[in-house]
C-alpha cells in the first residue's frame, strides 16, 4: 500500500515518487498481486470514478504518458488506460519494460510503475548505477542489506521500508546528487545552501 500511495499521490507528479521497482524474481508474482489489491483498496475497481483519485496537470501530459506506455514493451499487468480529455491516467504497472524505452529513460511523473525483476542484489545495484543518480532511493527488506546497497549507490535521499517520508521532516536535508539536483535545503541545510559564506 505504501508503494502504491507513494507512486500515485498527486497522480505520480511528485519528484520523489518511485520511478520504478527492482524486485527479486522469487517475490515478484506475490508483489504484483499485492500492488493491484492496494490500488483497489484505495480507489475501488475503477479509479476513474473515485472522487479522490487525482488527475494529470493537463491533457498534454496525459498524452505524453500514453506515448510512453505505447512504446514501453513488457507486460501491462494492470491499468494502462489514458483519457487525455479527462487528464486521467489509471494506476498502471508494467512488468519488465524495455530498458531502452522512453518509459525507462525519462522521468515518468505519472501513476505508472515499471517493475523490473532481478535474481541477485548485485544486479539491482548494477541497474541503479547504470542510471542517473536518483533523488530518492527506497529499499524494502533487511536494513543491513539496504545499507550495503546505499554504500554502492549514490542518491539524494534514502528511506528504508517506506516511501516519500524522508521529505516530510523539515529537519532533514533534502536535495539531489548530479542529475537529480545539487545542494540541500530544509531547516539548517537551507541556510547553508542559500547563504554565501565569505572569508
Task: Name every feature range the model reports, one short phrase each.
Residues 1-98, 160:
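ALDH superfamily catalytic-core signature
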Residues 88-199:
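Conserved C-terminal structural/oligomerization subdomain of aldehyde/semialdehyde dehydrogenase
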